[in-house]
Amino acid sequence: SILAAMAILGLVDTLIPLLAERFGLWQFHATRSALVLAALLAGAAALGWRLRPRRWRGVAARSVMIAAAMTVYFACLASFSIAQAVAGLFSAPVWVVLVTALVLRRRVGAVAWAAAAAGFAGVLMSLGFLGGGAEVSAAALLPMAAGLFYGVGQIGTREWCAGEGPMTLLFGFFLVIGVVACAGLALVSLLPEAVRLEAPAQAGFVLRGWQAPDATFAAVVAAQAAGSLVGVGLIVRGYQLAEASFVSVFEYTLLLFASLWAWALFGQGVTAAQGAGIALILASAALAARFGTAQRPAPAA
């Protein structure tokens, strides 16, 4: 079920560039959040899902971190290849180790440091900083910002949200990112039209306001909403059926599935350096899981 979840999430994330030229990031997040929140409320009414958190502050803080991560991640999908965006997101375990050791002042074993270093090298290779050959700008580090926020959110899941159910966390995340998206729409509407029109194509995805939806927008957003719900459900089921340290490794196959979907749908390949980077990230995840130091990456919502 984990592999099926990663295949679904990889597919729906690959569709984002279809929206980037005509629609905006904030419109996408606001619409998707509305659909998912409606589905969660319907599920709570029909199936008894618990959406109310036991610890409001913890769930709110965690939701803010994950919302920040997903805002940066989806913005990157319009400017970077899918492999680069996902690799940046999966720098989260590196940040988890650093924050745990340097901020929380907790002991981190040598294997965890080695796995984090290998994963970090893999991310840098995927982003073109190692072995790419071509000149790379500092902007290529942006996907790693998503990983930083995601890593803090992972720590928050464990430290602040113990005992909270997956539907509660999902509801909190989509509620927060929906509010952020509405605020984003309001802010970009205040920008002079000349600024929005003269922005580069990639920046336009972030600066663009509300546009009249069409069939493509509706299809992509519906697929994203359904994919988020089904993907999370399959992941939860996978963790119920097998040992967490074993299952967590398979979540990193999102890198493979996203790259395969990008190649199949848009002919977007990966370089040799990016392929080696992806392999190194997967190897670091397996190493961490083998010695009980894995940090579950959690689904890209």
Name each region found by the language model.
Residues S1-A4, W49-F74, A138-M144, V195-V230:
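Loop-to-transmembrane-helix transition segments
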Residues M6-L11, L41, S63, A67-T71, ...:
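Hydrophobic/small/kink-forming positions within alpha-helical transmembrane segments
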Residues P17, L40, G133-R196, Q211, ...:
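Transmembrane alpha-helical segments that form core, pore/gating elements
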Residues R22-A68, L148-G156, G172-S189:
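Transmembrane alpha-helices of multi-pass small-molecule transport proteins
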Residues V86-S91, W160-V176, L229-W263:
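Helix-helix packing/entry segments at the starts of transmembrane helices
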Residues A92-A117, L256-Q274:
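C-terminal transmembrane-helix exit sites in multi-pass transporters
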